[in-house]
Swiss-Prot record:
Annotated Gene Ontology cellular component terms: cytosol
Protein name (database record): DNA-binding protein MmarC5_1518
Keyword annotations from UniProtKB, A to Z: DNA-binding
UniProt organism field: Methanococcus maripaludis (strain C5 / ATCC BAA-1333)
Pfam families per UniProt: dsDNA_bind
Residue numbers spanned by region Disordered: 1-35
Keyword DNA-binding appears in the UniProt entry: yes
């Protein structure tokens, strides 16, 4: 077999696999999307209750810049609010301090390089 035939065969196999996965159960995919939407709506409702307007806008800006960090912050806020450890509504100043603490906890360890000269 020449390399072109091998590439064609692999391409066909990959396309067949993608079609099988896509056509497996569209109903299950639709339900998963619905559940995801429900989850997001509920999360936004809780965040509206616990954050002030300024804090919400700050979180929205963070979400644009660092979506993964914002998701982590949202989960932390929800957990703390459910445990009753947050003042409601959360002011922007308090939120800034909380962001600093969360960032410090999740920041990778700073590596130091020392050069020894002989």
């Amino acid at each position: 077999m020449n390399p072109e035939e091998i590439r064609q065969r692999r391409l066909q196999e990959m396309q067949a696999k993608a079609q099988e996965q896509g056509a497996e159960d569209p109903e299950a995919q639709r339900q998963a999307q619905e559940q995801q939407m429900q989850y997001e709506m509920q999360k936004q409702k809780i965040l509206r209750q616990i954050l002030s307007e300024d804090a919400r806008s700050r979180l929205a800006r963070i979400k644009l810049a660092k979506p993964q960090f914002a998701e982590h912050v949202e989960m932390q806020l929800i957990q703390l609010a459910q445990a009753g450890k947050l003042p409601v509504p959360l002011t922007d100043e308090y939120f800034k301090g909380l962001l600093d603490r969360i960032y410090e906890m999740n920041r990778p360890a700073k590596k130091e390089i020392t050069i020894m000269r002989k």
